[in-house]
Amino acid sequence: QAWVKWAWLEELGSGLIVLSGADQGALGAALLAGDEARAETLAARLAGLFPQRFYIELQRAGLPSHEAHVRAAVPLAARLGLPVVATHPVQFLEADDYDAHEARVCIAEGETLANPRRIKRFTPEQHFKTAAQMAELFADVPSAIANTVAIARRCSLTLVLGKPQLPDFPTPIMADGKPQPMDAFFRELS
């Protein structure tokens, strides 16, 4: 599981838009464990670090934890005056790709599809959804869809296909006053 130090968020979080991680994040785990006090503390801390940029994330992809999380997260967001956002944990392109995805998962885990005790972490619903499908999934929480659209607009960018667009990554300055070439720098690091 990924993690980030609070100090990093405090130091480097300027301009970030932060989602809570749905049922898989620390806030979601607290809600699913019934620890509303911890969930409220986490949400308040994140909202303080990221004013107008922290969203409680909701997902509905057919896992039991998703609906339990939504039932706990929406009231928490309302109590704290925080926005919710709808996202979808996509694992494959189309619904018909589910069986192939499960076969790949079994290969990676050394399992067989026929094993009735195999832990199933994915559902057939984890394909790309259309805007209409997402709106239907969250018809009872329309603000979650509206916030998804608002975040997408805030994050708009233009990519040129076939041309890598890498972040500016400063390298150490060499004796001649020029930055060290990236390939040489990364070769030293490896």
Question: What is each residue range found by the language model?
Answer:
Residues 1-190:
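Phosphodiester-processing cores and adjacent nucleic acid-binding clamps
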